[in-house]
Amino acid sequence: MDKLEADAKEAVVLQEKEVVEKRTNEAKAVQDEAEHDLKLAQPELDKAIAAVQKLEKNDIVELKSFTAPPPAVVMTMEPVMLLLGHSKDWKTAKSVMSDATKFLAELKGYDVKTMKEKTIQQIRKDYFKKADFNPSYVGDRSKPAGALCTWLLALSNYQTVYKNIVPKQVKLAEMQAVCQEAQAVLDEK
């Protein structure tokens, strides 16, 4: 190979290297943006976790003991039941809460990433828009229900941000794959 060919090959390699670096920087920017958004959402998730961590078995027993629960308790338990995949009626709620330990574990182990968009949209529309649906009002009627109200609102807020992060994570994975492939080709040269 003469000098002219070597120079031409080197120019191509340098050009490809610049393209790889540009794509890597673009991927890093997407990653930074996704991480930034996730950090903004994290306090909401922490708030949701803290709300259910405060609940104890006796709190669930208190909720379950209502034969005719205050409307604020019903208004809170219905979306909790929907979110957990149960029927929203009070009879079902009492049945689910009959094993307080299991119910608490279900709340504490709830994975917000599996939240169904249709369900949370329904909850937002049917419950969150009510003036009385706030932790203070609900908590004045039942402290455990107030904590669950906080949990619901915080999970909803987290989910709003999280669903916007998912496309960024998909885009990032695609960009990283392209970068790795381009880098492998470049390394062969």
Language-model regions, residue ranges each:
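Extended alpha-helical scaffold/assembly modules in large eukaryotic proteins
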Residues: K39-K189
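Heptad-repeat coiled-coil alpha-helices
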Residues: M1-L38, L45, L172-K189
